[in-house]
Amino acid sequence: MVMEEGRSIEEGLLQLKNKNDDSECRITACVILSTFVAVCGSFSFGVATGYTSGAETGVMKDLDLSIAQFSAFGSFATLGAAIGALFCGNLAMVIGRRGTMWVSDFLCITGWLSIAFAKEVVLLNFGRIISGIGFGLTSYVVPVYIAEITPKHVRGTFTFSNQLLQNAGLAMIYFCGNFITWRTLALLGALPCFIQVIGLFFVPESPRWLAKVGSDKELENSLFRLRGRDADISREASEIQVMTKMVENDSKSSFSDLFQRKYRYTLVVGIGLMLIQQFSGSAAVISYASTIFRKAGFSVAIGTTMLGIFVIPKAMIGLILVDKWGRRPLLMTSAFGMSMTCMLLGVAFTLQKMQLLSELTPILSFICVMMYIATYAIGLGGLPWVIMSEIFPINIKVTAGSIVTLVSFSSSSIVTYAFNFLFEWSTQGTFFIFAGIGGAALLFIWLLVPETKGLSLEEIQVSLIHQPDERNQT
């Protein structure tokens, strides 16, 4: 009986798909404002990501830290984010997307202020962990919120702005870290969180979360604000309600649901993308760019400043192309580019060690780091979060989102902590390992990652639910 009802609901959803509704194509001021407010947290996260690169010298000198202590400090943000990932999904479901961002702001502000006024390593590490927990919440809820409020034809572009603002924060830390103290940098990291706290009072809640909790009147009000007061929101509201009803009838939303046959594929895609994003070396290269430049004999000040200048235009490429080229082409281009640049970095440091053409190592390393960050920014930097926000149905989004976010930050913490030790063990070997993982990432994307460009969230989720059956038939 439930299966028959589920099929009839799916048929109704597919019929709704064939109807045109211009209201879904509108980009209103409310959508733009809501996205801007949401990505303020992403900017602060970007500052935290590059903070160890910009603050390394000052922190180690002022607080007399060893390499091991500073490596631990660097990894504590991702460790905290992994802790936040355990709660992000449930928190976002219980108190909503806006409420979760408020909680994140409180944690991030507390953490940044603790770092800024730290006189000893204990308070420094406390601030890093607490802010990390906040970033764990932000990294999940921001792309989910943006994906749930934006029209489908620009959803990728708007959701990718999450990565753009992370890169903006990264650019600021690379640029300002050359002449601003590490304590002032921490205060700058807290500023976007204060802006978000205020801005959240003026933006609507996610209509899909409102449908999940049964607030149909608030759902309509949210859609009217997002699509315009004169818009016909009936089709979109019906589609959201139909899909919500379908997944609720189909499942009790327990942890075991994740391992149902129809959801395994999406879980493999979500977790796989996060693993290859981190183990291809992104967190290490971004966090310790100054260390790489120093080892290569290239000017740290010039290298980080140039990264700061070019990191935003690089992300803009992905922002422009994500809804034109699609997710898969950008991801494959990104994985290939990251693999090749890591291979060349390994070659550069091999030449340096063998004292063969070692004069090429500084400039080759600089070019490779720049190209690595560029190819990372257009694809694997932001698209795993875009796809994560799209592929999970509302009934498993809580648990699946938490697991995927936990995997991301746990693996990032491992890579960030281990990098300095790997770098001392074998500089060139470290990058050859990253290159090999990048090659495996290319194969994974080609074989498994679906294209979601131009589809509504409901259309994506219906098609992916049937993906295992379609694969068995072929």
Swiss-Prot record:
It is a multi-pass membrane protein. The chain crosses the membrane at residues 27-47, 76-96, 106-126, 129-149, 159-180, 184-204, 266-286, 302-322, 329-349, 363-383, 403-423, 429-449. Coiled coil: none annotated. It is found in: Membrane. GO terms for biological process: response to nematode. GO terms for cellular component: membrane. SUPFAM superfamilies: MFS general substrate transporter. This is Sugar transporter ERD6-like 17. It comes from Arabidopsis thaliana.
